[in-house]
Structure formats: C-alpha cells, structure tokens
Amino acid sequence: DHDVILLQVPLFWYSTPSILKEWQDLVLEHGFAYGAGGDKLEGKRLMLAITAAGPDDAYTSGGYQHYPLRDFLRPLEQTARLCGMHFSAPYALYGTLRAPAAGEVDPHVEGYPALLEAIRDDRFDWDTAEQRDVLGYDSLPIGKEG
C-alpha cells in the first residue's frame, strides 16, 4: 500500500511512450481507478521523472516547442484528477542531447535519489511541488527530517 506513483519516462513526440498509454489502459480501469467504486487511487500522488531532448528555453511560449513542458503533461494531470489523485510538478532533465557535455547529468542523477529519499522519509513538500510547473535538481522542495 503506497501513497505515491512515480513514473520515469522520456518525452516522445510531445507525449509519453506508448507503453505507458498501454499501462494506463490496462490498469486505470473503471471501477478501480475511477467511476463507481473506483477509489483505489484516491488521495494518492502522481509524479513524473521526465527527460526532454530540447533545452529548457525551448519549452516556453517564445521557444521552438511553443509551450511549457507542463502543458504537454496535461493529459496525465487530468488522468490523475479523474482518479482522485494529486498531480505534482515533474522532476525534469532538459536538453538530454547536450546534457552530458554541459555537465548537467551528474547533478540531476544525484538529485534523483535525494528526491526518492525525501519522498520515502516524508520530507518532500508536496504542497510546494504541486504549485510549481517543473522541478529540477536545484529546486527540489525538500525539508529537514522531522
């Protein structure tokens, strides 16, 4: 019995890979995830760890993707809401095509276990995360152990 579903996916053609859509079709059934009796996910949290090939400035109204990354995740956000879940800002690594040369992979990789540990240890500030558009290794809302 867990409270958080964390999906780790790349952004493919402005969406998630088809295997995730298949998982949604098989698991998120009426009577389980939504609809009459479909309360098994109610109150749980959905978060994505996502990679995008383009740099962060590409995902702006003036960038070549024309929209923020979060806009491409709206179907997942709405799915979470339909299932009674809370949708958190994604943990994102932009510019994966240049990230290794730019030295951005190591901090992101180090931030990921910090994120997981904070979730496990109940130190992750979900309220703050739900208000943000995107989370990065340098902007994780992690509190002190309490």
Ranges and model annotations:
Residues 79-146:
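Glycine-rich phosphate/pyrophosphate-binding loop and the adjoining helix
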